[in-house]
């Protein structure tokens, strides 16, 4: 039997609606659901939807997180994975953001 790698992944389905004016009345138009990797809060989902639907009056109706366990044979993982290269400490120091200096 092949060895399997397992990983628990949380995805969040975001249900969003758009406000539209029809005959002088505001109506709600349900938009397609979006799914994101991770456990998003309502605020995070709202921010992402506002970025996607720039300038449109959209509102997140609900967020539905769902966690499932995924598995993959180790051989398949090795076929598609890349080796992670550790950075030297000197390289890390150069890539870090400079610290703010406090005026005395």
Swiss-Prot record:
Pfam families: p6. This is Histone-like protein p6. Residues 85-104 are annotated as: Disordered. Histone-like nucleoprotein that binds to the viral dsDNA and responsible for wrapping and compacting the viral DNA about 4-fold. Forms a nucleoprotein complex in which the DNA adopts a right-handed toroidal conformation winding around a protein core. Binds ito most, if not all, the viral genome, although with different affinity, the highest one corresponding to the genome ends. The formation of the nucleoprotein complex at the genome ends, activates the initiation of viral DNA replication. The binding of p6 would recruit the complex formed by the TP and the DNA polymerase to the origin. InterPro entries: Histone-like_p6. GO terms for biological process: chromosome condensation; DNA replication; DNA-templated transcription; regulation of viral transcription; viral DNA genome replication. Homodimer. Homomultimer. Binds to double-stranded DNA giving rise to multimeric nucleoprotein complexes. Binding specificity for the viral DNA is based on supercoiling, the viral genome having a negative superhelicity lower than that of plasmid DNA. Interacts with the DNA replication protein p17; this interaction optimizes the binding of protein p6 at the viral DNA ends, thus favoring the initiation of replication. Interacts with the late genes activator p4 (via C-terminus). It comes from Bacillus phage phi29. The gene is 6. Belongs to the phi29likevirus histone-like protein p6 family.
């Amino acid at each position: 039997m092949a060895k399997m790698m397992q990983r628990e992944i949380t995805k969040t389905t975001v249900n969003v609606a758009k406000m539209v004016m029809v005959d002088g009345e505001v109506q709600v138009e349900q938009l397609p659901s979006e799914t994101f990797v991770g456990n998003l809060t309502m605020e995070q989902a709202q921010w992402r939807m506002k970025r996607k639907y720039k300038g449109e009056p959209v509102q997140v109706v609900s967020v539905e997180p769902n966690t499932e366990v995924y598995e993959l044979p180790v051989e398949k993982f090795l076929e598609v994975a890349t080796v992670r290269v550790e950075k030297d400490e000197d390289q890390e120091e150069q890539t870090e953001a400079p610290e703010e200096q406090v005026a005395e």
